[in-house]
Amino acid sequence: MKTYPVQLEVAGPAAMWTRPDTGGAFTSYPAPTYSAAKGIFESIARLKSAYIRPIRVEVCRPLQFHRYATNYRGPLRKANQLKIDASYQLIAVILVDVCYRIYGSVEEATPSPVATNHLHALQEMFMRRVSKGQCFSVLALGWKEFTTSYWGPFRDNTQVESSLDLEVPSMLHSVFDKPISGNLNPRFVQHARIEKGVLSYAQ
């Protein structure tokens, strides 16, 4: 069976791959989750009948965690804060100076609505947009305020952080039960491992 691989390098001054188990004191995973990587791919190209399934991610800079604070003024503040129009201060532990190489494969979600090969069409659309620096929406490294300083083809001087070996006891994999138009059904992977700087995503 023919495969339709894609790949992308992303980098930025900050990233937040939020661990749900850290509650209100948000803390980042060391690498993007499956769903975060899928969202990055979809920021560049998407179809209703096909999607890009993340396969693995390579960590390309040393892990640096940093304390971060921001003022939240959205609708989820407490009633007394809303009443006096007060901000809620969010404290988080984020990653700084990050770089990743993400690999994926175009997969079918539903039968193609047209006679053309929609898997090849999505692959070509993705590769064309990456080469031209075009995207569907602004790429973010987790939180929307953490935009990229670079996204595009692999750069020759980027190196995998091969000294990095660690285990994440429980890591969010996906949020929905289907790759497209799914219902909320979070899935976690136990004992996810980053080995020689590489995190392979579960099927």
Which positions does each model-derived feature cover?
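Extracellular structured ligand-interaction cores
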Residues: P5, P54, D97-R101
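Residue-level signal for secondary-structure boundary sites
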Residues: M16-T18, F65, T110-S112
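Short, hydrophobic/aromatic beta-strand segments
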Residues: R19, Y51-R53, P113-A115
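Short, surface-exposed loop/turn motifs at beta-strand boundaries within globular domains
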Residues: M1-T3, Y34, L95
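Beta-strand elements of well-folded, non-transmembrane domains
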Residues: V10-A14, R61, I102-T110
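N-terminal, Lys/Arg- and Ser/Thr-rich interaction peptides
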Residues: M1-G24, Q190-L199
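Internal, well-folded beta-alpha domain core
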Residues: Y72-G74, A79-Q203
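Glycine/small-residue-rich interface belts in oligomeric ring/scaffold proteins
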Residues: T22, T27-T70
